[in-house]
A protein has these predicted regions:
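Short, basic/aromatic recognition patches
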Residues: 1-26
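Intrinsic disorder/low-structure terminal segments
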Residues: 9-10, 32, 145
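Short beta-strand scaffold segments in enzyme catalytic cores
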Residues: 26-41
């Protein structure tokens, strides 16, 4: 897919947010609604307690979860307003390589499940030198993060 000028702008903003991450793999995410950015974030080490569904049983906070969490709390738990907003929201998900360029940024299984649960309208990401735009309900992945794989292996010891 070739990004429009507006999509290119949003994806660039997402990539800029990825550079703020202190993690080994730097991910960023921008949420847009009505052509405007409504939330932005990047992946971080988890440094707070879990009081919501976005951070339970996790050692880090993914960029997508950071953004969904911000939208959720922005609406003060007003479910009707959240549902209406999420149904019209597009997430631009990026990953910044060591040389500063965009690299594979498809959401992991856990993030995709949360994106689907919150009825996000579209996701845009970079994979194998191409950009993709999907309705999250039409997208499937088996991608697990290194952290998830490590935690799974620990539970089998």
């Amino acid at each position: 897919m070739i990004l429009s000028k507006k999509q290119e702008k949003f994806f660039s903003q997402s990539l800029e947010h990825a550079t703020r991450s202190s993690m080994q793999f730097k991910h960023g995410c921008i949420a847009t609604y009505g052509g405007h950015v409504i939330a932005s974030g990047y992946n971080t080490h988890k440094n707070y307690s879990s009081h919501d569904d976005f951070t339970n049983n996790q050692c880090s906070l993914h960029a997508e979860m950071d953004v969904l969490r911000k939208i959720y709390w922005r609406n003060n738990g007003n479910r009707r307003k959240q549902r209406r907003m999420m149904k019209r929201t597009t997430l631009y998900i990026s990953r910044c390589s060591k040389n500063g360029s965009s690299t594979n940024s498809a959401p992991c299984m856990r993030c995709l499940q949360m994106i689907q649960q919150y009825n996000i309208r579209k996701i845009v990401f970079h994979l194998d030198d191409l950009y993709y735009e999907y309705d999250p309900k039409q997208y499937e992945t088996s991608h697990q993060t290194f952290g998830d794989i490590s935690l799974t292996n620990l539970t089998h010891i």
